[in-house]
Swiss-Prot record:
UniProt cross-references to InterPro entries, sorted A to Z: Etherase_MurQ, Glucokinase_regulatory_CS, MURQ/GCKR, SIS_dom, SIS_dom_sf
The reaction(s) this protein catalyses: N-acetyl-D-muramate 6-phosphate + H2O = N-acetyl-D-glucosamine 6-phosphate + (R)-lactate
EC numbers on record: 4.2.1.126
Protein's recorded name: N-acetylmuramic acid 6-phosphate etherase
GO molecular function, one term: ether hydrolase activity
Length: 298
């Protein structure tokens, strides 16, 4: 696909004279365009749901969720991956973000990195990619060689693959087993795909990782019951989670959390089933870590 023919490289009539308007009008133009992004994502919800189900199946069998991207796309993958351990208590290696150019590229532009097919393959080899893993290639244009080569290598290994782009019929979409293509149209600043396309990618990644965690028992109701208390705010959140899940008061919630080394799931089962910490943990283990299953009458 030629660059000049891509939707993400098109000219947006709504912003054709954005350099001549007031600051407030400038903001309105950008905001009006941003409003279209959730609607574009809504149109591909079935594709996102299909990807979540596959990711959950693979991760449940011992696989990992691997994000692969360049520039903004790579940074968004790293951002999503880095939030999973503190939010859901998973090991840091379960969700992995890879960016063309390596760690230096997180904060700096690395010339030519996205054009390196070898880089995409080598980065996956370096993390010991296996057929059980899922590789999600992220590229707004859908033409990034680093991502395409990585997806091709992953498929050769037998991995399930997902391609996220914002141009229909892109190479990323055709290379991946599952294509997620929110078409957000031309950017306010021509070709600046960190804007609407980046926002769409962020929304999709939010759904992929959150959907995986919900289906893995990391959420009870809408509570993040595997949150790790790494600061005072999260200590308070843990107490509120136990309170909201059980109806107990703050003192009871804190006492239960202390007794079970601050594991919200265990504390919730302790309170609701009147068990001690060891009994509650055993009950959870017997039910795969799912609170609802642990609470069912035996």
């Amino acid at each position: 696909m030629q660059l000049e023919k891509m939707i993400t490289e098109g000219s947006n009539a709504a912003s054709a004279e954005i350099d001549r308007v007031s600051t407030l009008e400038m903001c309105r133009i950008i905001n009006d365009e941003d409003k279209t992004v959730p609607l574009a994502v809504e149109r591909v919800l079935p594709d996102i749901a299909a990807a979540i189900d596959v990711i959950h199946t693979q991760v449940s069998g011992g696989g990992r969720l691997i994000y692969l991207g360049a520039g903004t796309s790579g940074r968004l993958g790293i951002l999503d991956a880095s939030e999973c351990p503190p939010t859901y208590g998973v090991k840091p290696g379960l969700v992995v973000g890879l960016i063309a150019g390596g760690e230096y590229a997180i904060q700096h532009a690395v010339e030519g990195a996205e054009d390196s097919r070898e880089g995409g393959v080598n980065d996956l080899k370096n993390i010991g990619l296996t057929a059980q893993d899922v590789v999600v290639g992220i590229a707004a244009s859908g033409r990034t060689p680093y991502v395409i080569a990585g997806l091709e290598y992953a498929r050769q290994l037998g991995c399930r693959t997902v391609g996220i782009s914002c141009n229909p019929g892109s190479a990323v979409s055709s290379t991946a087993e599952f294509a997620i293509t929110p078409v957000v149209g031309a950017e306010v600043v021509t070709g600046s795909s960190r804007m609407k396309a980046g926002t769409a990618q962020k929304l999709v990644l939010n759904m992929l990782s959150t959907g995986l965690m919900i289906k893995s028992g990391k959420v009870f109701g809408n509570l993040m019951v595997d949150v790790v208390a790494t600061n005072e705010k999260l200590h308070v959140r843990q107490v509120n989670i136990v309170k909201n899940a059980t109806g107990c008061n703050a003192e009871q919630a804190e006492a239960a959390l202390i007794a079970c080394e601050r594991n919200c799931k265990t504390a919730i089962v302790m309170v609701l089933k009147n068990l001690d910490a060891d009994e509650a943990k055993k009950c959870l283990d017997q039910h795969g870590g799912f609170i609802r299953k642990a609470l069912e009458k035996e």
